[in-house]
């Protein structure tokens, strides 16, 4: 069952970038209607297959453009093979690194996403390059990352998630 929010994001993205049609129709989707999934959207490997998670309540708060951009962001994780290239890496740092690599290329994302400039890093580098830079920064700062601006409501910065629970440093 697809929700109107997901369907609208799907249609808007396909209108803007039909390239994604093949990926979107082939990927199994898990639509969370009860806000149990701790992120707005994500891709994961489940049972050997890539699955798209969509948190309906969270995404319903975003504009249609932000919803479509979020969907594009998740599809780029798949296209750029971020799910398999990150094996053996620190999960939080790899998430930050892959998000920075993608977010430079996607227009219309929600305001609370991560960009390279937040870590004094240049745009348009690979996820591996960002990962090494973040790892180096964390090692220099006793395991903490220094983010340049506050990221309100980012799922990694919520208590009980993968972050430290404040909006300025990640673990």
Summary of predicted features, one role per range:
Residues 1-69, 75-171:
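Short, functionally important secondary-structure microenvironments
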């Amino acid at each position: 069952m697809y929700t109107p929010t997901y369907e609208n994001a799907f249609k808007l993205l396909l209108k803007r970038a039909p390239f994604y049609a093949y990926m979107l129709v082939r990927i199994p989707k898990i639509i969370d209607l009860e806000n149990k999934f701790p992120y707005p959207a994500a891709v994961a490997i489940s049972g050997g297959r890539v699955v798209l998670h969509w948190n309906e309540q969270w995404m319903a708060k975003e504009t249609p453009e932000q919803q479509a951009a979020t969907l594009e962001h998740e599809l780029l994780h798949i296209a750029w093979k971020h799910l398999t290239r990150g094996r053996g890496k620190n999960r939080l740092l790899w998430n930050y690194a892959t998000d920075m690599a993608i977010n430079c290329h996607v227009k219309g994302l929600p305001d609370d996403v991560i960009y390279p400039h937040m870590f004094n890093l240049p745009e348009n580098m690979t996820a591996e390059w960002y990962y090494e830079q973040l790892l180096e920064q964390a090692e220099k700062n006793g395991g903490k990352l220094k983010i340049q601006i506050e990221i309100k409501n980012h799922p990694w910065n919520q208590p009980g998630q993968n972050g430290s629970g404040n909006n300025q440093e990640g673990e």
